[in-house]
From Swiss-Prot:
Belongs to the thiolase-like superfamily. BioZ family. One of its GO terms (molecular function) is 3-oxoacyl-[acyl-carrier-protein] synthase activity. Residues 256-260 are annotated as: ACP-binding. Involved in the formation of the biotin precursor pimeloyl-ACP. Catalyzes the condensation of glutaryl-CoA, an intermediate in lysine degradation, with malonyl-ACP to produce 3-oxopimeloyl-ACP. It catalyses: malonyl-[ACP] + an acyl-CoA + H(+) = a 3-oxoacyl-[ACP] + CO2 + CoA; glutaryl-CoA + malonyl-[ACP] + H(+) = 3-oxo-6-carboxyhexanoyl-[ACP] + CO2 + CoA. Keywords: Acyltransferase, Biotin biosynthesis, Transferase. It comes from Agrobacterium fabrum (strain C58 / ATCC 33970). The lineage of its organism: Bacteria, Pseudomonadati, Pseudomonadota, Alphaproteobacteria, Hyphomicrobiales. The gene is bioZ. Disruption phenotype: Inactivation of the gene leads to biotin auxotrophy. Its EC number is 2.3.1.-. Changing residue 255 to A: Retains low activity. This is 3-oxopimeloyl-[acyl-carrier-protein] synthase. The active site is at residues 115, 255, 285. Disulfide bonds: none annotated.
Length: 328
């Protein structure tokens, strides 16, 4: 029998200093003015500069969340870092993050779940809090600008750098936290979005072409249609499992991949547009970081109140994806 749940006790986010507007990218790709915003909803995004690191970006977001939660560092028992762009292939970046934040009693691991990584981390964190009654720091962060192929329009116009963080703490009210979750994978779309080189299947080599170390989106339309279907279907299942309808959702926080994608999923679910949290216009697509960044921003604009019901959903490379209903 459940005796506790989890509570979102603190939020944080961080972006690099450099803001890149559409005009700069449109000029480099030979696109007409306004092309990017019309097709993606993005007006600007943030890209890392020479001294920026993934762990540094994650640290800023994590510290903000810890301060917001007003929690002692010794109370954090686990640190989960969802990222596709760690500082190094080995070791993982999460132990360094925990060290810099002074989390001396925390375990720490990286999770590589692409754009849906935060949902996986959040679901695992909620289970840990319920089982062990100890707090968890969840951070999602990416520096995607260093993996963009500047000549490939599909990825060059979308991707951004950012970090978002949430602190989960134990809560005695069992009807809070994750009410339902549906995490899925479809490996038939494994190569739709990829960085070919760097793994054990294709290690870095002296004769490697530069593009193999950069992100490639093989078929943008296929990615769009699969992602919309995946996010719609998983969202419908978690609503059904939680015995809720779209009308019961207080805020809908989808992965900020593309404004048209969010609109399509929102329409499929029958969720009112004003309930949808949108940050893609100013921050672009930072993969797993978009949902916690959006949570931090919406909480700053209008604090999340106890009892609010959130619907979170994402889809990304792999393909991986899912949806979560979370009661604040």
């Amino acid at each position: 029998m459940q005796t506790r749940s989890s509570r979102m006790a603190g939020f944080g986010h961080a972006v690099p200093a450099r803001c890149v507007d559409n005009a700069e990218i449109e000029a480099s790709l030979g696109l007409e003015a306004g092309w990017i915003e019309r097709r993606t909803g993005i007006r600007s995004r943030y890209w890392a500069e020479a001294g920026d690191t993934l762990s540094g970006l994650a640290e800023r977001a994590g510290r903000m969340a810890l301060e917001d939660a007003k929690i002692n560092a010794d109370d954090i028992a686990l640190t989960l870092l969802a990222t596709s762009t760690p500082d190094h292939l080995l070791p993982p970046s999460a132990p360094l993050l925990a060290h810099r934040l002074g989390l001396t009693r925390s375990g720490a691991i990286d999770l590589a779940g692409a754009c849906s990584g935060f949902l996986y981390a959040l679901t695992l964190a909620d289970g840990f809090v319920r089982t062990y009654g100890r707090a968890v720091l969840v951070v999602a962060a990416n520096i995607l600008s260093r993996r963009i192929n500047p000549a490939e329009r599909a990825s060059a116009v979308l991707f951004a750098d950012a970090a978002g963080a949430v602190v989960l703490t134990p809560c005695p009210e069992v009807k809070r936290g994750v009410l339902s979750a549906d995490l899925v994978a479809d490996g038939s779309g494994y190569d739709l979005i990829q960085i070919a080189a760097g793994g054990s299947s294709q290690p870095f080599s002296a004769g490697m072409i530069a593009e193999d170390a950069l992100m490639t989106m093989r078929d943008g339309r296929e990615v769009f249609s699969r992602a919309v279907a995946l996010m719609t279907n998983t969202s419908q299942r978690v609503l059904h499992e939680a015995e809720l309808t779209a009308a019961d959702i207080s805020r809908f926080v989808p992965h900020q991949a593309n404004a048209r994608m969010s609109d399509a999923v929102c329409g499929n679910l029958g969720i009112e547009r004003e309930k949808t949290v949108r940050t893609i216009g100013s921050f672009g697509n930072s993969s797993a970081a978009t949902i916690p960044l959006s949570l931090s921003i919406t909480n700053a604009e209008r604090p999340l109140a106890g009892g609010e019901t959130l619907l979170l959903t994402a889809a990304g490379a792999g393909m991986t994806g899912g949806a979560v209903v979370y009661r604040v």
